[in-house]
Regions:
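Conserved loop->alpha-helix
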Residues: 1-205
């Protein structure tokens, strides 16, 4: 489990396709590389991935993304040099400063607008939503929580297939929101509490 409080960004060094496999091995460098361990869970742009190898000589580590993950997230869009938001899994005695994040991306959204207002940046996103998705809780709620590229954020405006969030300068600096521009895709994980409530309502109908 994660909290959506990004620790830092990792830099993609290379994307390798193992022979005969549809998986992709992603090698990244990050300041706390020497604190990582094989089999450890780390969220990358909100996607929970397992550390499969560590490379002390280049201060890097490798994770593997399967085809399902590549299709459902924006990890397949990554190129060497790109920055990725990273967060290690929560400790049992840690604080939940964001909201409950599973690291299971639901879908992607497209950034369709940026506006600087009073020192903060407002980002508008659009995503495809069907009646079935909405009934399963795959939606946003004004003043509710949503996880975007692994960042726990509060929705400031919500419509059926669009929503808006506000990013303060600090968050923009320590995450890859500073690299985000119109037309780029981001990963979305909707609030798990909302999804459970939607499921409960469906059962009762």
């Amino acid at each position: 489990m994660f909290s959506g409080i990004v620790e830092t960004t990792a830099r993609v060094l290379r994307m390798d396709h193992p022979h005969g496999s549809t998986n992709v091995d992603i090698t990244l460098t990050v300041p706390f590389w020497d604190e990582l361990a094989i089999d450890q869970s780390v969220a990358h742009n909100g996607v929970c991935l397992t550390v499969v190898s560590i490379h002390p000589e280049e201060k890097s580590y490798t994770v593997t993304a399967v085809q399902e993950t590549l299709q459902r997230s924006n990890l397949g869009d990554l190129r060497p040099g790109d920055r990725v938001n990273v967060e290690r899994s929560m400790r049992s005695d840690g604080r939940l400063d964001g909201h409950i994040v599973q690291g299971h991306v639901d879908t992607t959204a497209e950034c369709i607008g940026l506006e600087d207002v009073g020192g903060s940046t407002y980002y508008t996103f659009r995503y495809s939503v069907t009646d079935e998705m909405a009934a399963r809780g795959y939606t946003t709620v004004e003043k509710g929580s949503v996880c975007i590229n692994g960042v726990s954020l509060t929705v400031v405006d919500s419509e059926r297939d669009t929503f808006k969030v506000a990013i303060i300068p600090y968050t923009k600096e320590i995450t890859n929101f500073g690299d985000l521009s119109e037309g780029k895709r981001v990963n979305l994980e909707f609030d798990i509490i909302g999804k459970y409530l939607a499921k409960l309502i469906t059962f009762r109908q």
